[in-house]
Amino acid sequence: MFKKPVKTALAALSLTLLLSSCGGGSLPNYEYEIDMKPYKNALTVTDQAYRILVNKENPCGADYAPESLSAIPSELTLYGKSVQMESTAALAAEALVRELHARGYTDIVVTSGYRDYAYQQVLFNTYLGNEQAKHPDWTTEQCRAEVLTYSALPGESEHQTGLCMDLISTGNVTLDVTFADNPAYAWLVDNAHNFGFILRYPEGEEGTTGYSYEPWHYRFVGVDAATKIYKKGITLEEYVK
């Protein structure tokens, strides 16, 4: 799944996935609107590698990357742009967005998936520049601390794993908390786990996840783990303890 994990634990998890990448479970008791045959094996993976924890305390290195990337179909991405994810996660993401569309939430598309280390560095620096322009009386460290509440340093972003995606509405192409006002959000909160995804940064869990609330950010962990996380109302950090 991944080319060069930095930490030994991550390397072991990656090897587990390479040895067994086929789905090993059953689909949940949920009435899917779409044909799930093309997606079942992706959703039901049980490999621990899909539960890799990447955050401020568990960084990965500059050369850490998915071994296999697949593109999300362009009709499911914002403006048809190229968005890639780890191949199994990409299939699960496709299933989730197609289900959203089948249920009438046709404005929801994927705007971001895999990001490499270098891209995250550019993104972080851009945010830092924005904060410095917004707060000219702040020190660089103050601006940096502000950015760290909503953006990861390169190596600390789980976007680098290829296992997460950012969703957006074509009617409001700004990634902010107003995504929670979209009717699709309530459906996602209650049903994303049926496609192996969790809301990665829930409201009120900043102290646990290290990041502010992101109603648009969904992480693939497989149906089994996602369902347990959903039912317990916990974060990925709490689940992998």
Predicted feature locations:
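Sec-dependent N-terminal signal peptides of Gram-positive bacterial secreted proteins and lipoproteins
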Residues: 2-26
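Extracytoplasmic cell-surface/polysaccharide-interacting catalytic and binding patches
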Residues: 2, 22-241
